[in-house]
């Protein structure tokens, strides 16, 4: 409930709204501690009203406290139910975190002009990006499991292994030790595929690892993370199956230096774009600036990509309690890529790497 009160303070007292509609499943979990909910309407006065379809109603009743609960039947119009309650609460300025076009259109129609709608998901994002002690405890556990997975990667990668076999060993090791799942589709990108930052895969289609056989002397980018009580971690290492070539070692040392310089720059009050610039300068000075093709990092928490963002376009400033990634890389088409990534906690005066897997370039084969 403290989180709901914090949102009320931001949305109602500071911004002047008198209602807030939460529809993102992740945001709903953040505020209620219950997965599988549909929506929650928070009026300026009184309790928040949670909407759950009948399939999840008993779960919601069991897992939530301090809220009113309304069950929706299959096929019932959610936006009509929300609008009815908003009118009953005399809400005139209704903020929301996210709505697709059709839901927005339906809600506006049902409200009949009695309340103005405005997207304000950034207010929830501002709360979520500062982790409290309980969240940090869970993220430390997720990072611990992730570190275990990366150690397995170093022990598993060898010539003749298939990419999906390496992923399976990593994921099994993390699951066996308590991971609730994987933070995202594990990326095992070997050979020329390592020059693609996501291993040639897609967010929804997957494909971060394939049936390709790892060959002796190839670069292998391993990007993976564990989940613990819905909180995630993220780590990347670049590993050679065999003895590294001179060029591979050169690229690795440049990326490692970029990673380490960025880590020094991650501190409370730092501009996120300046941290990105610090990492980017190291790579540019070495002659590979055009091959660092993405931002330095992103926030991690209930989602593997959330605020704040570390890039040249970011307007974010870092603050105590932020958890972000530090992941510079160099990607040479036809040769391969190198990336090193850690999940980092912003502390008072410094930064702490939550992930701490090996930093060796050579596999333990």
Give, region by region, the residue ranges found by the protein language model.
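Active-site neighborhoods and metal-handling regions in enzymes and metal-associated proteins
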Residues: 1-365
């Amino acid at each position: 409930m403290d989180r709901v009160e914090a949102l009320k303070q931001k949305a109602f007292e500071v911004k002047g709204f008198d209602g807030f509609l939460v529809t993102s499943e992740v945001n709903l979990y953040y505020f209620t501690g219950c997965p599988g909910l549909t929506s929650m309407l928070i009026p300026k006065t009184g309790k928040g009203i949670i909407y759950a379809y009948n399939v999840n109603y008993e779960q919601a009743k069991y897992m939530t406290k301090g809220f009113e609960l309304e069950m929706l039947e299959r096929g019932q119009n959610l936006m009509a139910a929300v609008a009815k309650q908003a009118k009953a609460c005399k809400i005139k300025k209704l903020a929301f975190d996210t709505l697709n076009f059709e839901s927005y259109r339906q809600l506006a129609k049902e409200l009949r002009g009695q309340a103005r709608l405005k997207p304000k998901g950034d207010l929830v994002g501002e709360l979520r990006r500062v982790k409290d002690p309980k969240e940090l405890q869970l993220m430390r556990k997720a990072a611990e499991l992730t570190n275990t997975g990366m150690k397995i990667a170093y022990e598993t990668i060898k010539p003749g292994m298939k990419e999906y076999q390496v992923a399976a060993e990593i994921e099994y090791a993390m699951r066996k030790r308590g991971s609730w799942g994987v933070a995202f589709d594990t990326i095992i990108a070997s050979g020329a595929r390592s020059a693609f930052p996501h291993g040639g895969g897609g967010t929804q289609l997957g494909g971060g690892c394939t049936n390709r056989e790892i060959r002796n002397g190839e670069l292998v980018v391993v990007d993976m993370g564990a989940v613990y009580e819905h909180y995630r971690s993220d780590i990347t290492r670049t590993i050679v199956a065999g003895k590294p070539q001179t060029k591979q070692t050169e690229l690795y040392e440049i990326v490692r230096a970029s990673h380490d310089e960025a880590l020094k720059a991650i501190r409370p009050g730092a501009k996120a774009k300046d941290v990105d610039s610090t990492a980017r300068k190291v790579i540019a000075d070495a002659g590979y600036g055009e091959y660092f093709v993405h931002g330095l990092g992103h926030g991690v928490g209930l989602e593997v990509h959330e605020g704040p963002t570390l890039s040249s376009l970011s307007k974010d400033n870092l603050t105590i309690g932020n958890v972000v990634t530090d992941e510079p890389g160099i990607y040479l088409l036809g040769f391969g890529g190198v990336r090193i990534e850690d999940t980092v906690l912003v502390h008072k005066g410094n930064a702490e790497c939550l992930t701490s897997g090996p930093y060796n370039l050579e596999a333990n084969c």
